[in-house]
Amino acid sequence: MALGGGTFTSQNKELPGAYINFVSAASASAALSDRGIATMPLELDWGVEGEVFEVTNEDFQKNSLKLFGYAFDSPKMLGLNDLFMGAKTLYAYRLNGGGDKAANTYATAKYCGVRGNDLKIVIQKNADDASKYDVTTYFGTVKVDTQTVAKAADLVANDYVTFKAADLAVTAGTPLTGGTNGTVDGTAHQAYLDKIESYTYNTMGVVVTDDITKKLYVAFNKRLRDELGIKFQLVVYNLSADYMGVISVKNKVTDAGWSEAALVYWVTGAESGCAVNKSCQNKKYDGGFTVDTNYTQN
């Protein structure tokens, strides 16, 4: 019974008729699963080499210096800041590993890369015990570690350097030098794809401008989607892929020191966090890059 009869809850109705309650199970979430998981291969000045490593939004804000070599609000982190505006978790891979580690008489950088050249070791006599030294590690202008020891053998490796068995001597600051980034080539991109294939993520983004590398990623996307049933979206820059699994970003970035394809960061994050019953169409860009929007109607 509907309308005047009301909804049946107990045998207290006055109007005759059939009262039927329809109770359905809780509907499935439109999200289907936790979204906001992205993956990207990155060119970095510091960080883990040869492995996929997980970074959450919280990790990025709290441990960006340790993970990427720069504070999260550094201009060098502009791309990742854009990514984490939409993403919750990033599976990152460093493309340019395999370079040289910076070093000096007392220590060697934990990772290769030019950022290691901004490390320095300061050694002072301990104020309370003249037989001991205060050994301080600086990353840029940030003090990241201090240890008080009698000899170098007592020093423990920290998140930035490993120490050598050298004779300690007072120094106002001995910089580490010789750090270099590795070379990015097709082999590095393929190594990333081999590593990431076993992971689960919503969106993959790659910041490149050459069509050969873009097509390598498109082929990977098609194989996983069509042959293995693993559905994810690939974000690339300015490529007519004509495929439902690929998102092509047309607008270019004009900021000095950044690839014109850098808007891929923001789109990758936004798409990864977008629910399956929603769309990023007409979503306003609110990231930190300067975007070329000087287009005509045709």
Regions found by a protein language model. Name each.
Residues L3-S24, A28-G47, V52-T56, F60, ...:
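A glycine- and small-residue-enriched flexible loop/hinge signal that marks low-structured segments
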